[in-house]
UniProtKB/Swiss-Prot annotation:
The lineage of its organism: Bacteria, Bacillati, Actinomycetota, Actinomycetes, Micrococcales. Monomer. Its cofactor is Mg(2+). This is tRNA dimethylallyltransferase. Catalyzes the transfer of a dimethylallyl group onto the adenine at position 37 in tRNAs that read codons beginning with uridine, leading to the formation of N6-(dimethylallyl)adenosine (i(6)A). It is an enzyme of class 2 (transferase). InterPro entries: Dimethylallyltransferase (IPR039657), IPT (IPR018022), P-loop_NTPase (IPR027417). GO terms for biological process: tRNA modification. It comes from Clavibacter michiganensis subsp. michiganensis (strain NCPPB 382). It comes from the Bacteria. Substrate binds at residues 11-16.
Amino acid sequence: MIPIVAVVGATGTGKSGLSLDIADRLRAQGRVAEIVNADAMQLYRGMDIGTAKLPEAARRDVPHHMLDVLDVTAEATVAGYQGEARRVITGILGRGAVPILVGGSGLYVSSVLFDYEFPGTDPEIRQRLERELAETGPGMLHRRLRELDPAAAQRIGAHNGRRLVRALEVVEITGPQPERASAEPRPWHPARILALTLPREELVPRLDARVSGMWADGLVDEVAGLLPAGLADGVTASRAIGYAQAARQLAGELTEEEAMEETRALTRRYARRQVSWFGRYADAVRLDARDERLLEHALDALPAARP
């Protein structure tokens, strides 16, 4: 059985480059690989610079899926992503190709790799919790979630209001989960997880340079072009790191340096959460992103890459 290859890790660790190198090596062996995006913000059309989305010319003729599938006004949901990504992967496997799942959005990755089930939604509960978030802030919601579902509270953290609302909505629908296991559930399909790592003292300068590069490459102009398309009204897209700050810069609420510094701080915080999330993958093969023989070590871990 062909396994899913998952390339995961924090922002700035080189996931896209490694996934393309693996696909190239498989192609040299007569195997076909196709890449499936697992970065929530790369789902959006037009959000390219701030998400480090690979342009077509840089994709080395490797098929890419789950990119540019949503308008900025649409809400990205893990449940919706899970169904579509699994449909795509099933098609890749049916063609005898190797699916390479690539991304840093931890819950999106886990929703594909593991046997996650997502409860439905209740608009009345959601609206009530969103009003409470607007009135009291995320701290109160996080304290309540910590009592009702400690594992979810630890996973989400105290500042992600949107995810806190969703977690509390699920608790109200399904009941409290005080003893829910924090371990990953059963695999959906055989997979080999490659987790890229970097020491924090080397990752942080990469992240800071990445933010500077986003502004230099035209992120503010990209955001200016997306605002008429409804970016400010997008439940998910409007909150994307970098995009929210660039929009506030355009509105005169932040200077350029303030917008960049806020983006740097949020990017560092997000990277810490990514490291924590992927650190829970007990079966992952940990790979040092600085290793000169990174590709060889990655291929050694992949049954699909053996001639």
